């Protein structure tokens, strides 16, 4: 049987705490000592072929330096084991810009880190760049169903909720919200965009500089291509949203809106 072992390099990805996966107190992978012991045992096995070293330090990483530290740890462990891996899976985590003016990963610096490693090790490299490919390919379109004035803010209650886009409620991720129709109008003083679910965490964004909205207006929740649909659920007995593919002038329905009878 061909297998791989996931190594925990004890590297801080400098990302959202809940999606950091490469520190020693995270549940993923094995530490250096255990990894070396496993490789030593598997070298002698007649039935198990160790093929791959795998590592993944987290998601939504926007700085090349954590990758640099991770690569140094991988290089060190390979030299310590003196084992020739057919594959080294360097994971993913390459971040995108979710907020206006948010820093993005410098791919030139990232590639130089990888290039240096490749020159030292004759092995095939595997990457998992999911978010960086599809993250900005989708938007969630929502309608304003109610405006609720409350103390010092206005709640903009949308017809989408945390069941449709879980990231903000799950770990405080920020997604830009834009009006579908931009008009010159008075800016809001304090909008809080929320869903209609019975959870305080059913909140998307607070904005102090948004165009004035009315019931029935449409907004975009941006960059939902990664972990949007895959994290969606029927929580609160809410049917899942439809998914539509737009390719230039062509429109294709990928998933129809769920009906209540499909859930029950």
Which residues does each predicted region cover?
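Short acidic, glycine/serine/threonine-rich loops at helix termini
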Residues: 13-20, 64-66, 98-103, 136-140, ...
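General structural feature for long, well-ordered alpha-helical segments within catalytic domains
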Residues: 31-38, 49, 63-73, 86, ...
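Charged (often Lys/Glu-rich) extended helix/loop segments that serve as interaction or gating elements
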Residues: 113, 122-264
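Generic beta-structure capping elements
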Residues: 6-10, 93, 161, 196
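Active-site-proximal beta-alpha core segment in soluble small-molecule metabolic enzymes
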Residues: 1-87, 96, 113
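Acidic/histidine-enriched ion/cofactor-binding microenvironments in catalytic or ligand-binding pockets
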Residues: 1, 76-79, 83-85, 105-120, ...
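Flexible loop residues that form catalytic
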Residues: 58, 93, 224
